[in-house]
């Protein structure tokens, strides 16, 4: 079984982001980076699939030279190969442009039975790239996967989280899965694999190499961010003390003042 996992490098979520109002970008200079956590669930799921069914796991990302550290982390967890899609044309790509580029890269790398992504990246929470890859490749998809139930030569059955509860879905291979945190607990890299990952050669691909049209990505993407801003701070709550009747009277009065009722 050939498995590919898409990894995204994101700013450290323990740091409050600063925004550049002129560019609508998050200021990343001097900010530590990390792998989007749901993507590590995807790597773990891929490793378990090949441990149970044979094959190998490859990891792929789109970004600059610095994103190789995230690919090396995937290798240190147990992936066999890593690929970097790197081209300045992809800068400022929206979810469609990112999905398009990754799908082109996947086609150029080879055939895969299962393609795994995190359910969403924690920097934008869009959750669109995994489904977009499936659409671009014209293959099955199961989103918000909480458990991989079974795999046959032709199908994969998984449980997925939905607003109505939990669903069990069977899809034909090849299939794209987007992974929930509850799917598994990502393993820690071993020292041996970390050393091997640090020495590994990571092939780079650009638009020309994967057959992607630069006119469709980056600033030419179908959508663009109009405004990026931090939410207004919430007011702290007010604690009302007294007997129940008095509390109810004060609470109603305040709700009327706020025009809530």
Predicted regions and their residues:
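N-terminal glycine-rich FAD/FM-binding segment characteristic of electron-transfer flavoproteins
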Residues: 1-261
């Amino acid at each position: 079984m050939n498995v590919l996992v898409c990894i995204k490098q994101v700013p450290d979520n323990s740091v409050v982001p600063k925004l550049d109002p002129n560019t609508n970008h998050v200021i990343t200079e001097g900010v530590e980076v990390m792998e989007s956590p749901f993507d590590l669930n995807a790597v773990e799921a891929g490793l378990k699939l090949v441990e149970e069914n044979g094959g190998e796991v490859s990891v792929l990302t789109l970004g600059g030279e610095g994103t190789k550290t995230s690919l090396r982390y995937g290798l240190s967890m147990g992936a066999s190969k890593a690929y970097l899609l790197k081209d300045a044309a992809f800068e400022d790509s929206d979810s469609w442009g990112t999905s398009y580029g990754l799908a082109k890269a996947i086609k150029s790398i080879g055939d895969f039975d299962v393609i795994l992504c995190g359910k969403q990246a924690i920097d934008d929470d869009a959750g669109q790239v995994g489904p977009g890859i499936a659409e671009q490749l014209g293959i099955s998809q199961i989103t918000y996967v909480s458990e991989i139930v079974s795999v046959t030569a032709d199908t994969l059955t998984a449980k997925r989280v939905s607003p109505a509860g939990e669903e069990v879905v069977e899809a034909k291979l090849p299939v794209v899965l987007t992974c929930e945190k509850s799917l598994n607990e990502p393993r820690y890299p071993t020292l041996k694999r970390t050393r091997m990952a640090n020495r590994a050669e990571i092939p780079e691909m650009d638009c020309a190499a994967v057959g992607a049209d630069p006119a469709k990505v980056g600033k030419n993407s179908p959508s663009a961010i109009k405004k990026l801003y931090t939410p207004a701070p919430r007011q702290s709550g007010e604690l009302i003390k007294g007997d129940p009747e008095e509390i109810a009277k004060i609470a109603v009065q305040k709700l009327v003042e706020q025009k809530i009722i």
